[in-house]
Amino acid sequence: MLIPKRVKYRKQHRGRMTGKAKRGNRITFGEYGLQALEPAWITNRQIEAARVAITRSLKRGGKVWIKIFPDKPVTAKPAETRMGGGKGAPEKWVAVVKPGRIMFEVAGVSEELAREAIRLASHKLPIKTRFVKREEMDGEANES
């Protein structure tokens, strides 16, 4: 499970998820990627489930990169607790994902195998995603 080793502050504000991803929206390591089309908080458990789905589908072939890290603590108060008494204890860790963000990358396998692995991973995530190729991403960069 991915969690930060140490953080400066134990609790954080929720923040806003407006706009598109300005960073991490290009394929940098692999040949194929899984791109987010909606904004969401992705928990460390969801990231791990998607990673396991990809690695099992690839059957020890190819390489997988996880491009998001859950560095935001989400707090929760116990059930049936009265209001007040301060902010709850950190419950889970999430990665803030905006539209356009590349979440996973795959290399060293055929396109069909990569497409299937990424399809299985996308079912583990709570957002709409799409399969992207490095060639397509390079084409978009040249146009703009």
Curated annotation (Swiss-Prot):
Gene3D superfamilies in the record: Ribosomal protein L10e/L16 (3.90.1170.10)
Keyword Ribonucleoprotein: yes
Gene Ontology CC terms, in alphabetical order: cytosolic large ribosomal subunit
Source taxonomy: Bacteria, Bacillati, Bacillota, Clostridia, Halanaerobiales
Annotated source species: Halothermothrix orenii (strain H 168 / OCM 544 / DSM 9562)
Record-level Gene Ontology MF annotations: rRNA binding; structural constituent of ribosome; tRNA binding
Complex formation: Part of the 50S ribosomal subunit.
SUPFAM superfamilies: Ribosomal protein L16p/L10e
PROSITE patterns per UniProt: RIBOSOMAL_L16_1 (PS00586), RIBOSOMAL_L16_2 (PS00701)
InterPro entries according to UniProt: Ribosomal_uL16, Ribosomal_uL16_bact-type, Ribosomal_uL16_CS, Ribosomal_uL16_dom, Ribosomal_uL16_sf
Function in brief: Binds 23S rRNA and is also seen to make contacts with the A and possibly P site tRNAs.
Keywords: Ribonucleoprotein, Ribosomal protein, RNA-binding, rRNA-binding, tRNA-binding
UniProt-listed Pfam families: Ribosomal_L16
Keyword Membrane set for record: no
Protein name: Large ribosomal subunit protein uL16
GO BP, one annotated term: translation
Family from the record: Belongs to the universal ribosomal protein uL16 family.
Residue stretches in coiled coil: none
